Amino acid sequence: MGASGSKKCSRSLQGLRERLLRARGETCGGQWDGSAGEYLQFQEGSGRGQNLPSCEGQRYQQGDFMNTPWRTPAAGREGTLYKQQNMDDVDADNDNLIGVPVTPRVPLRAMTYKLAVDISHFLNEKGGLDGMYYSERRHRILDIYMEKEEGIIPDWQNYTHGPGVRYPKFFGWLWKLVPVDVPQGEEDHCLLHPAQTSGSDDPHGETLMWRFDPRLAYEYTAFNRYPEEFGYKSGLPEEEWKAKLKARGIPFS
C-alpha cells in the first residue's frame, strides 16, 4: 500500500471500527481485553501441509460459499431479499456505514492469500478487530465493507465449526475467533450487549471474539485440524469426511 492509499485506508478502517462497535449494542459496543482480563467500553467515535486446497486463483461462482451466514442468490425474489438485507445491515437505525460507497470503488475480485495477509496486518496495526466481540451482524458488516471499499467478493470470511477456537478457512486471513467467559455483571449491562448477541449467534452458545494470530500466515490450522470441513477439497475419501462431519453434528450435502 502506498502512502496516500494507506492514509485513505486508515480513515476507512476507522469508520469500519466505529460501525462495528455500534452494531447490536449502540452505546454498549465493546471489546474484551484478554491480556488484562478486563472488559473495555468504547463510546461512539472512539479514537502449510501436503494436499492443501488452493486458496488462490479460485474462480468465483455465485452462491458458492462455505459457512458464511449469508450468500448471494442468483436472481428473482431471493436476490431482492438479499439486497434488502444488505441495505438493512448498512442503514439500520439510520446509521450509515461511514464512508462506504453504494457500489464498489474498484472492480470485484476474489480474495487472495497476499491480500488477506496484508489486510489482516493493517487491521491489526489500526486496532480494527482485536478483542472485539463477534456476531453475525458484524460479520456481514465486515463483508460489506471489504466488498465496497476493496472490491473483495464476500465469500472468504469462513471459520471452522467449533466448539472452541474457530480458525479461518481462508489461508491468509489471520483473525481467528476465540471463546471468552464474560462475567454476568458485564452481560447484563444492557439489553443488546454484544457478548449476549454473540452467544445467541453461535450454534454452540459460546461468546466469541476476534483475535489476531500471525502464525496463521504460515500454518493452515483450519485444514490441518479439521480437513473434513473442506469436504471434497480435503483429499479424504468421501465416506471418511462425511462420517467425521456427522460425528461432530455438522450438516453436509
From Swiss-Prot:
Q: Which SUPFAM superfamilies does UniProt cross-reference here?
A: Regulatory factor Nef (SSF55671)
Q: Map out region (Mediates dimerization) in residue numbers.
A: 140-156
Family annotation (Gene3D superfamilies): Nef Regulatory Factor
Q: Which GO terms describe its cellular component?
A: host cell plasma membrane; membrane
Intracellular or extracellular location(s): Host cell membrane
What InterPro entries is this protein classified in?
HIV-1_Nef_core_sf, HIV_Nef
Q: How does it sit in the membrane?
A: Lipid-anchor
- Residues anchoring lipid (N-myristoyl glycine): 2
Question: A GO molecular function for this record?
Answer: GTP binding
Keyword Glycoprotein applies: no
The Swiss-Prot or TrEMBL note on domains reads: The N-terminal domain is composed of the N-myristoyl glycine and of a cluster of positively charged amino acids. It is required for inner plasma membrane targeting of Nef and virion incorporation, and thereby for infectivity.
Family statement drawn from the similarity comment of this UniProt entry: Belongs to the lentivirus primate group Nef protein family.
Per the entry, what this protein does is: Factor of infectivity and pathogenicity, required for optimal virus replication. Alters numerous pathways of T-lymphocyte function and down-regulates immunity surface molecules in order to evade host defense and increase viral infectivity. Alters the functionality of other immunity cells, like dendritic cells, monocytes/macrophages and NK cells. One of the earliest and most abundantly expressed viral proteins. In infected CD4(+) T-lymphocytes, down-regulates cell surface expression of CD4, CD28, CD3, and MHC-I or MHC-II molecules.
- Identify this protein by name: Protein Nef
